[in-house]
């Protein structure tokens, strides 16, 4: 059989090879934070875990263990063993863990062994793996030169990053496009899951032959996902590349992202009528979120233009009026804010250019 315990030296390999992991923590623990390659098959359900925890506080470890055995017994125990065995059969290279790699891991492994199923458990459990990934994030800015990709809203930074092996897509990991209108249809990950996925992406990046780590110039918050402080501080000190694009191209890109993609996504999810209502709410509420910064008069003007565009879209299947409010939003809000921020980091700008020019500059950076 394989080694019964997976040691800390193998943590990196677990994530790089996306080993399937059977997570036997309670569902509430899994929901708070987990790894992309893990599946929750709990030893105890939330209610059972709560009872055992109360017993432990009141009567000690042995009484809590005895209660746990009485709660997970007979048909319930057999059902859980069968679920674990099915998972291991489908994933023969799987590992298992609980929170600390303690009693729950050992008991699960023992019960499976009695059912003639062998599966190693991970030393230190979820907690140790999580600490390992936090260390990966903190160390990443010291592993390679860090470059920050900046550019006006709508210039196509994400499109550009997705074409580069040097890049890690922070907005993709956060499932948010970073701007006031950056919310997607599916929810953002929990903060813990955002950090876990960021660390794994950084690990994968380190296996490439990229000469630098290229990241989009982000705020501390991407939607509600907060960048780890040490990592964010390093980004703030990084040299900057500025991606340039024409105003017309920016407008078309933003109409496609804010209007066409979001409308199609909502309709696909909810149907035509409910989808349009949800899409309209997304646009109007995104505008409300920056009302204080716009000022009441500017917000009202944009809201009126947005409503006219929505009316034209639903009545005439024409999205051209959306270009009017997007253009005003760019020139009255996004562009002045961007230029102010860029001025503060002007001394760190290494290069400015179009998509093609930026590709050529980075290609030459690889060979320096």
From Swiss-Prot:
Q: What is its EC number?
A: 2.9.1.3
Query: Biological process GO annotation list?
Result: tRNA wobble uridine modification
Q: Which InterPro entries match?
A: Rhodanese-like_dom, Rhodanese-like_dom_sf, SelU
Q: Name one GO molecular function term.
A: tRNA 2-selenouridine synthase activity
Which reaction is recorded as catalysed by this protein?
A: 5-methylaminomethyl-2-thiouridine(34) in tRNA + selenophosphate + (2E)-geranyl diphosphate + H2O + H(+) = 5-methylaminomethyl-2-selenouridine(34) in tRNA + (2E)-thiogeraniol + phosphate + diphosphate; 5-methylaminomethyl-2-thiouridine(34) in tRNA + (2E)-geranyl diphosphate = 5-methylaminomethyl-S-(2E)-geranyl-thiouridine(34) in tRNA + diphosphate; 5-methylaminomethyl-S-(2E)-geranyl-thiouridine(34) in tRNA + selenophosphate + H(+) = 5-methylaminomethyl-2-(Se-phospho)selenouridine(34) in tRNA + (2E)-thiogeraniol; 5-methylaminomethyl-2-(Se-phospho)selenouridine(34) in tRNA + H2O = 5-methylaminomethyl-2-selenouridine(34) in tRNA + phosphate
Per UniProt, residues of the Rhodanese domain are 15-138
Keyword field contains Cytoplasm: no
The record places the active site at 98
Gene3D superfamilies documented for this protein: Rhodanese-like domain
Q: Which UniProt keywords apply?
A: Selenium, Transferase
Tell me the HAMAP family matching this sequence.
Answer: tRNA_sel_U_synth
Q: What does this protein do?
A: Involved in the post-transcriptional modification of the uridine at the wobble position (U34) of tRNA(Lys), tRNA(Glu) and tRNA(Gln). Catalyzes the conversion of 2-thiouridine (S2U-RNA) to 2-selenouridine (Se2U-RNA). Acts in a two-step process involving geranylation of 2-thiouridine (S2U) to S-geranyl-2-thiouridine (geS2U) and subsequent selenation of the latter derivative to 2-selenouridine (Se2U) in the tRNA chain.
Describe its assembly: Monomer.
Q: What is this protein called?
A: tRNA 2-selenouridine synthase
């Amino acid at each position: 059989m394989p080694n019964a315990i997976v040691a800390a030296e193998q943590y990196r390999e677990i994530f790089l090879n996306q080993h399937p992991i059977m997570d036997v923590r309670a569902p509430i623990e899994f929901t708070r934070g987990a790894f992309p390659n893990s599946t929750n098959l709990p030893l105890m359900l939330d209610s059972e875990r709560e009872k055992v925890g109360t017993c432990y506080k009141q009567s000690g470890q042995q009484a809590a263990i005895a209660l746990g055995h009485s709660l997970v017994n007979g048909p319930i125990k057999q059902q859980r063993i069968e679920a674990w065995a099915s998972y291991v059969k489908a994933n023969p290279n799987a590992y298992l863990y609980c929170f600390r790699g303690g009693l729950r891991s050992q008991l699960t492994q023992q019960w499976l062994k009695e059912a003639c199923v062998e599966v190693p458990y991970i030393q230190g459990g979820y907690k140790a793996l999580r600490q390992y990934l936090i260390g990966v994030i903190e160390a990443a800015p010291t592993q390679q030169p860090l470059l920050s990709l900046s550019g006006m809203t709508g210039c196509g930074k994400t499109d550009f990053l997705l074409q580069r092996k040097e890049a890690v897509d922070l907005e993709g990991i956060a499932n948010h496009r970073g701007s006031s209108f950056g919310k997607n249809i599916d929810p953002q990950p929990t903060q813990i899951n955002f950090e876990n996925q960021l660390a794994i992406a950084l690990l994968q990046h380190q296996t490439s032959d990229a000469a630098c780590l290229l990241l989009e110039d982000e705020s501390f918050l991407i939607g509600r996902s907060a960048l780890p402080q040490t990592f964010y501080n390093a980004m703030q000190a990084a040299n900057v590349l500025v991606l340039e694009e024409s105003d017309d191209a920016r407008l078309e890109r933003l109409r496609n992202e804010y209007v066409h993609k979001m409308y199609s996504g909502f309709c696909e999810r909810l149907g035509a009528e409910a989808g349009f209502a949800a899409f309209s709410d997304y646009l109007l509420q995104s505008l409300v979120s920056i009302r204080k910064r716009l000022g009441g008069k500017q917000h009202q003007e944009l809201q009126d233009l947005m409503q006219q565009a929505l009316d034209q879209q639903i009545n005439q299947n024409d999205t051209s009026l959306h270009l009017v409010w997007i253009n005003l939003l760019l020139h009255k809000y996004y562009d002045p804010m961007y230029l102010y921020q860029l001025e503060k980091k002007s001394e760190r700008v290494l290069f400015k250019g179009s998509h093609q020019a930026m590709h050529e500059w980075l290609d030459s950076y690889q060979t320096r």
